[in-house]
Amino acid sequence: MIQSVFSDDAWSIWEPLIETVRPKGKTPPRDLRRTMSAIFWRHQNGAKWRSIPAELGPWWTAAQLFIRWAKLGVWQALFEQAKGQDSALGLVFLDGTNIRAHHKAAGAAKKGDSGERRNDREALGRSRGGFGSKVCVAADGHGKALSFTLTPGQAHELPSAMALLDALPHAPRYVVCDRGYASNQFREALWDRGSRPVIPTKRNEPQVACPKWAYRHRHLVENLWARLKEWRAVATRYEKTATSFMAVICIAATADHLKT
């Protein structure tokens, strides 16, 4: 017997947030709690929609709601509601990870484009780690996600950095990154924004100050990725479209914010 993903206490937290962001012109499922449990079960287990246990309701109800809300930006809005305005922006960490795509993730409609353009549109590409996507995150001083970018797997992390920071309510005091972000131009851009860069230099670069006490906390963003990848549909991309995959990431990040 599959129990609801949401205990009474958990649902008392989730329900008002969902009611805030769900489309008001649409009638919610008769049992929204059960449908949400089905969506969560599918993404936590990386299963096919048809594999959703019957106790959680018709699989097509869950699939239709997930896809419709993904296209409307509801899951992104839910993530924004969950993170609130009390994020710890003294330290902000930037980090990216490659997510390998399941072979069925490459089946999105071409819409008149070539296969290459289709893959670029859906944030899919081939890197040394295989065929997949690059997901970058900005995390706060508590190790909680603040913003995401999604690009093809072969993309470098640095071009996504400013988009991650632009999504924050104000400039953080310190921006902590690994050597993949080492660039004098990027450091200068951070200073111009009022943020101090905490980025180790590469071996072929002149030494630049990098406060060790701040860099020592970079494990917080690594731990965030470890938690998010406990969702099998985050650790492996099963979604054909970038919109749906970003929705999965937002659901996992929302759950991480609301975890007690």
Task: Cite the ranges covered by each PLM segment.
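Short alpha-helical elements
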Residues: 1-260
